Amino acid sequence: MGANQLVVLNVYDMYWMNEYTSSIGIGVFHSGIEVYGREFAYGGHPYPFSGIFEISPGNASELGETFKFKEAVVLGSTDFLEDDIEKIVEELGKEYKGNAYHLMHKNCNHFSSALSEILCGKEIPRWINRLAYFSSCIPFLQSCLPKEWLTPAALQSSVSQELQDELEEAEDAAASSAMASAAAGARTGRHTKL
């Protein structure tokens, strides 16, 4: 074991989602665990490998434009060495695969809490994952949210459908434009003998 290192929970406001959920008194937050000057977090993707990633601590811009840093919460300290933490994160990656992500049942806050419990024996504050907690108590709440928020597969399906629709619209517009050009060319290119 090594020197005591602070274990910090970095919390980010997901304000695009909060526009919908704040009306029912629930905030939606992303979180990551900072230790040794590195921040580990979990997110979804449609593939069966680890969804754990690393960002610069507190840097919301690395998460995307819809995230805003909210606060840092000191959870405790750990004696694990940095190499040990890398191994722990790698092991957690077997459980926290990208395609296992679910907003209510296995999200970034569940990961942060699991890592925090290993590193310093403490869960994250309950208010950070309140939406998931309420969803387990009030199952219909999940049905009120857009399905593409819940899993990466649903999001990918939604995005794929939107892209397909846009592609079809572009093809239709191009075909209409080509037909209009051909019709205009046919009218202006007509010569009559007198």
UniProtKB/Swiss-Prot annotation:
GO process terms (BP): proteolysis
An MF annotation (GO) of this entry: cysteine-type deubiquitinase activity
Pfam families: Peptidase_C97 (PF05903)
Reactions mediated catalytically: Thiol-dependent hydrolysis of ester, thioester, amide, peptide and isopeptide bonds formed by the C-terminal Gly of ubiquitin (a 76-residue protein attached to proteins as an intracellular targeting signal); S-hexadecanoyl-L-cysteinyl-[protein] + H2O = L-cysteinyl-[protein] + hexadecanoate + H(+)
Domain PPPDE: 5-149
PROSITE patterns, per database record: PPPDE
Keyword Aminoacyl-tRNA synthetase belongs to the record: no
GO cellular component: cytoplasm
EC number: 3.4.19.12, 3.1.2.22
Keywords: Cytoplasm, Hydrolase, Protease, Ubl conjugation pathway
Group of enzyme by EC: hydrolase
Domain of life (superkingdom): Eukaryota
Active site: 30, 108
Compartment(s) of residence: Cytoplasm
Principal location class: cytoplasm
SUBUNIT field: Interacts with RPS7.
Function (record text): Has deubiquitinating activity towards 'Lys-48'- and 'Lys-63'-linked polyubiquitin chains. Deubiquitinates 'Lys-48'-linked polyubiquitination of RPS7 leading to its stabilization. Exhibits palmitoyl protein thioesterase (S-depalmitoylation) activity towards synthetic substrates 4-methylumbelliferyl-6-S-palmitoyl-beta-D-glucopyranoside and S-depalmitoylation probe 5 (DPP-5).
Protein name in the entry: Deubiquitinase DESI2
